[in-house]
Regions:
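Nucleotide-activated chemistry modules centered on ATP-dependent adenylation/adenylyltransferase
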Residues: 1-148, 153-447, 498-503
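C-terminal accessory/binding modules appended to enzymatic or scaffolding proteins
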Residues: 446-464
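Residue-level signal for threonine
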Residues: 182, 306-307, 476-477, 562-572
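Short, solvent-exposed segments of well-ordered alpha helices
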Residues: 118, 314, 450, 477, ...
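Donor-sugar nucleotide-binding helix/loop cap in glycosyltransferases
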Residues: 503-614
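Short linker/helix segments within small regulatory modules
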Residues: 312-315, 469-483
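Iron-sulfur cluster-binding cysteine motifs and their immediate structural context
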Residues: 458-474, 485-501
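Cysteine-cluster motifs in flexible loop/terminal segments that predominantly coordinate metals
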Residues: 317-332, 453-459, 483-486, 493
């Protein structure tokens, strides 16, 4: 809401009267992080972690209003490089912005809080009123309200605000325990659970029936495209837990969520209120949407709210131990703090992935870019499609669940559908004329489930009526209304989506020439960046050109299914013509495109060679 500046006197933040349009997301920096980055070699400070000494914005470190250091690079097992900031004196000589040997003063928390109390009071009152007004509007229409609690800074503030806005008996708190949280997060959860129970507030922990190690081995490592982990380990267990608590399979509730618009490009498009965006069939309110991290931290200090020690160790977010949406220096800080726990997951990646450069694949985040089951050891397709003699055949060598149960969810099965058990497995067929139709898509989704379903229970959570159960095996109630929400998942089944192989099986590559004679041109890329999603609806490229260019955009992770990606938006912000942006794009291409990978593997560095040689 408010913009901020740095207060030289207190060493803290100072909210201004201006409304913030963009925040650099400041966070406090404690002694543990200073030591980790090697700043103890240059400046003196007490080895205490109760009060911060500096603030960090992205890669920059600010001490009492002056940028004194910055870091570059960093990866899972590679520390970022620390660079001290120099300033030029009048005589032209460069000196350290903060002289070596300086004794750092801790932030004066009480003074900082006092100087911000009026602005914080306004922010608090506005947010509390929004929460109460929302509750008042829906309290007679919904079965429950709950706070989605993660143990991070935003959810700690959110819970405090909801406590101030609503009667203690009117809501519950639900912690979505992925089983992959920081150990420091579990300490915060224990602490908050005890406080809630003392205050008469229901507190529940929701956890998947899968152990994370088992789900990683079942699905393969998650990635920024294959984000099965959030559904399997977070959203679905929360829905199922609330059904259990309320003893109502078709409950409709509202959750208070601590997302903020300034956290990421994607979240910048979130709305205050929504229906079905976070969890199908449920309402959500994002009370902190317009808060900046400056206001979050000031509110925490002003109200002496608990701070997850993960932040004191350099982590900007308190999430999962190894997240496909992370990478870079964030991975370094995580590993430095929780190395043994994280190594369990990196060892699992090594166990599962078939890559000759597996160490680089792990440490540089190649696993983050996984897009199918191609590189998973021993992965053989359990679903095969072929068109023959006027029919589309779906062949399932080893069915995992009953096709007749899943077929209950389909309103109008095609009259041409025929299913039989053959020696090669379960074989279903429909008329080939239906292949590109909506009904064929639905039938395929059902047989994806038949072939791959691992009882992750996401379909069960998606059913708004509670008509799907996996107790003792798959069972779909005959009262199913055939709404199709159980199929509103990527490819109808998360496990199929994660393990499916490319159409050619992903192993035999006929040619390295992945772009035929239509390598991407500057004009195409410029047009794509200027027009975004609109580019796919109207462009000047021919059929083969657009096909090859889509391959390029997909391999570079700039677009997927005719939609620009968050990575594209990031490179656009950096400046798509810059070396930095193209360096990032090249990294993606190396992992995904065999032609680019071949160049990297076979061409010597810093040498010119004729095209004919290549």
């Amino acid at each position: 809401m408010y913009d901020y500046t740095y207060d030289i006197e207190t060493g803290g933040l100072l909210l201004s009267e201006r409304i913030s349009q963009l925040s650099n997301e400041p966070r406090p920096v404690y002694a543990a992080e200073l030591n980790l980055l090697g700043m103890d070699k240059y400046w003196r400070f007490d080895q205490q972690n109760e009060t911060p000494y500096m603030w960090s914005e992205a890669c920059n470190y600010i001490y009492r209003g002056t940028k004194v250091a910055k870091i570059k690079g960093g990866a899972l097992c590679q520390a970022p490089v620390l660079e001290l900031v120099h300033t030029k004196a009048d005589d032209g000589d460069a000196t350290l912005a903060l002289p070596q040997g300086t004794t750092l003063l801790a932030v004066d928390i009480p003074a900082m809080v006092e100087r911000n109390k009026d602005a914080l009071s306004i922010v608090e009152q506005i947010t509390v009123k929004k929460i109460y007004d929302y509750y008042k509007r829906y309290k007679d229409k919904l079965d429950c309200f709950h706070v989605a609690f993660s143990g991070g800074k935003d959810s700690v503030v959110l819970l405090e605000l909801v406590k101030r806005a609503l009667p203690r008996s009117s809501f519950m708190v639900v912690f979505g325990d992925t089983g992959m949280e920081f150990s420091d997060t579990y300490r915060i959860i224990d602490q908050e659970e005890a406080i809630c129970r003392k205050d008469g507030i229901e507190f529940h922990r929701a956890r998947s029936h899968f152990d994370p190690m088992d789900s990683w081995r079942l699905f393969g490592p998650p990635s920024n495209v294959l984000r099965w982990c959030c559904s399997v380990h977070k959203s679905a267990p929360q829905t199922l837990k609330i059904r259990e608590v309320l003893a109502k399979g078709d409950y409709v509730g509202a959750d208070f969520v601590g997302v903020r618009a300034q956290e990421s490009v994607r979240r910048a498009d979130y709305e205050y209120e929504n229906y079905g965006k976070k969890q199908r069939g449920q309402y959500s309110l994002n009370p902190l949407l317009e808060w900046s991290s400056a206001e979050i931290w000031l509110y925490i200090f002003a109200n002496a709210l608990p701070i997850n020690d993960a932040y004191k160790k350099g982590n900007s977010r308190a999430g999962c131990l190894l997240c496909p949406m992370g990478g870079g220096k964030a991975d370094y800080f995580r590993h430095a703090a929780y190395g043994k726990e994280i190594d369990r997951y990196t060892d699992t990646i090594r166990e599962l992935i078939d890559d000759k450069s597996i160490d680089t694949y792990v440490t540089n985040g190649g696993w983050i870019s996984r897009r199918n089951g191609r590189d998973i050891k021993g992965n053989v397709s359990n679903y095969i499609e072929e068109v023959k003699d006027g029919y589309l055949y779906m062949i399932i060598p080893k069915p995992k669940t009953s096709w007749t149960e899943w077929m209950k969810t389909l309103a109008d099965p095609p009259t041409s559908l025929y299913v039989e058990q053959r020696k090669e497995g379960l074989v279903a067929r429909i008329s080939a004329e239906l292949n590109k139709t909506s009904i064929a898509k639905q039938v395929k989704q059902i047989f994806h489930k038949v072939a791959y379903c691992g009882a992750c229970r996401v379909c069960e959570a998606n059913c708004p009526y509670g008509y799907i159960s996996f107790e003792g095996g798959l069972h779909i109630d005959d009262r199913c209304v055939k709404c199709g929400k159980c199929r509103q998942i990527e490819d109808g089944c998360l496990l199929y989506h994660s393990l499916q192989l490319p159409k050619n099986g992903g192993r035999v590559m006929k040619s390295l020439n992945t772009f035929a004679d239509h390598a991407p041109k500057y004009e195409w890329v410029r047009d794509f960046y200027e027009r975004g999603d609109e580019f796919f609806q109207n462009n000047s490229l021919g059929p083969m050109q657009i096909s090859m260019f889509k391959r390029f955009l997909s391999d570079a992770q700039l677009a997927e299914k005719n939609k620009v990606t968050e990575f594209m938006l990031l490179t656009k912000r950096i400046g798509w013509e810059s070396d930095s942006a193209w360096g990032l794009i090249l990294i993606q291409l190396v992992y995904e495109n065999p032609q680019i990978r071949w160049y990297i593997d076979n061409m010597p560095v810093n040498e010119r060679m004729p095209r004919t040689y290549l």
